[in-house]
């Protein structure tokens, strides 16, 4: 049975104390508000000094913790202390720190329930080659994908595979399409790898030089993949699973992004039975529990091909507003399994991140893209950050961006990389 978000008013479990990690992310802010609205007490642990949720009225307390990536042992020790001091009932990792939480999950479960699967399973899903191999072994549709572990392998593979099609090159450990190399279109007005609607294009490509990264960026420790380029529509999913059973699911269009293939800034619910069937089969076959997202291409043959997996919270959360039913999927998934229910967003749900969405609008003007469609999307979407009764995060986001910009300058990295540098996980301790 499918239940639309907002259609039911079931009594939730008694008020819980919920600890969220990853307070910098808009999904964490949105979920904190949903939990608060449902009567739960929300606490946040975050390694960044400036983050969206720290000033939210939905949050009881925030704690600044050590970097999960750079000081994992101290980070986990602090989470243990907070779980005890705040008498936490449920810990929900929201961003890439989920991998570090998984390392200490057994210790943390002494004090509270932890919504995370094993580190071994998380790694298999996060690794862009191992995930493809797993999905293929389950009989699910995925693109042809090759593992590249050296400059020599890169050159050898490139000389063979690029004679039979176009390819996307990307690190196996990456996020928000960072460092992705897309095929380049001949039409300079079109974005590399996408058409004027934001879909993957089948236009002819021009030859371009695709030199391999240096030995530091490409090795057996930091491999890349070459993945067959499939023209079609991009789709994303967000799901919550409990012991292999889906208790919440959303498929959404994310046609507006930061750059041509970067992080999504606009989210619109779509009905897509094939994407749902793919995710359901994967969850059942792997017995997965927790939050999980997938990126798909719907090819011209109408089949969906999974290109990546994100075993954590993704922006599909925003489509479940106001979120009472989604909260049930997180706090009492076993009840939904017994009831045979799966929560989905209301039909036509839309959400956006207003500031980067404005930047996307500028791209429409400069790139001669369909500004009218962008305006319609803007007018029909809820801003994730702005809530009249919780206004402070609107102002906080400017401080977050400024802090990230300063870090990006000092570290000589992109703004996106600066936003995740201290929580990202690249296969450490495997």
Model regions and ranges:
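ATP-binding N-terminal substructure of ATP-dependent carboxylate-amine bond-forming enzymes
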Residues: 1-117, 152
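Glycine-/Pro-rich loop/turn segments that contact NAD(P) or position catalytic residues
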Residues: 121-141
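ATP-grasp fold ATP-binding core
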Residues: 135, 143, 159-180, 194, ...
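Glycine-rich phosphate/pyrophosphate-binding beta-alpha loops
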Residues: 177, 256-259, 310-323
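Phosphate-binding site of ATP-dependent enzymes
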Residues: 184-257, 261, 268-274, 298-305
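Peripheral (often C-terminal) accessory segments that flank ATP-dependent C-N-forming ligase machineries
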Residues: 200, 328-430
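Oxyanion-binding "anion nests"
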Residues: 262-265, 270-294
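Conserved metal-phosphate-binding beta-hairpin within the catalytic cores
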Residues: 284-319
């Amino acid at each position: 049975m499918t239940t639309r978000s907002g259609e039911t008013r079931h009594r939730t479990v008694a008020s819980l104390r919920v600890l969220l990690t990853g307070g910098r992310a808009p999904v964490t802010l949105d979920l904190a508000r949903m939990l608060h609205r449902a009567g739960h007490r929300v606490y946040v642990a975050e390694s960044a000094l400036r983050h969206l949720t720290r000033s939210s009225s939905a949050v009881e307390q925030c704690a600044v913790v050590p970097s999960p990536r750079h000081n994992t042992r101290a980070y986990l020790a602090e989470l243990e202390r907070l779980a005890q001091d705040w008498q936490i009932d449920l810990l929900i990792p929201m961003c890439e720190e989920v991998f570090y939480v998984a390392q200490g999950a057994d210790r943390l479960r002494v004090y509270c329930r932890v919504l995370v699967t094993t580190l071994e399973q998380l790694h298999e899903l996060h690794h862009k080659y191992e995930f493809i191999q797993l999905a293929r072994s389950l009989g699910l549709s995925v693109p042809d994908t090759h593992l590249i572990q050296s400059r020599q392998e890169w050159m050898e593979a490139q000389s063979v595979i690029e004679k039979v099609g176009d390819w996307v090159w990307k690190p196996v450990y990456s996020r928000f399409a960072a460092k992705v190399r897309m095929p380049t279109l001949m039409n300079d007005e079109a974005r590399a790898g996408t058409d004027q609607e934001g879909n993957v294009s089948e236009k002819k490509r021009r030859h371009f030089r695709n030199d391999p990264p240096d030995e530091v960026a490409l090795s057996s420790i930091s491999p890349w993949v070459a993945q067959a380029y499939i023209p079609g529509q991009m789709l994303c999913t967000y799901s919550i699973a409990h012991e292999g059973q889906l208790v919440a699911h959303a498929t959404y269009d994310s046609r507006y992004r930061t750059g041509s293939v970067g992080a999504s800034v606009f989210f619109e619910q779509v009905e897509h039975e094939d994407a749902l069937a793919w995710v359901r089969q994967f969850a059942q076959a792997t017995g997965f529990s927790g939050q999980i997202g997938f990126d798909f291409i719907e090819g011209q043959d109408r089949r969906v091909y999974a290109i990546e997996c994100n075993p954590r919270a993704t922006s599909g959360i925003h489509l479940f507003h106001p979120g009472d039913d989604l909260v049930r999927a997180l706090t009492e998934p076993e009840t939904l399994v017994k009831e045979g229910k799966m929560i989905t967003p209301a039909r036509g749900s839309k959400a956006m991140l207003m500031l980067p969405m404005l930047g996307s609008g500028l791209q429409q003007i400069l790139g001669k893209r369909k500004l009218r469609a962008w305006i319609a999307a803007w007018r029909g979407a809820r801003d994730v950050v702005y809530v009249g009764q919780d206004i402070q995060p609107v102002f906080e986001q400017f401080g977050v961006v400024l802090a990230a910009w300063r870090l990006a300058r000092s570290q000589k990295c992109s703004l996106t990389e600066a936003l995740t540098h201290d929580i990202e996980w690249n296969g450490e301790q495997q």
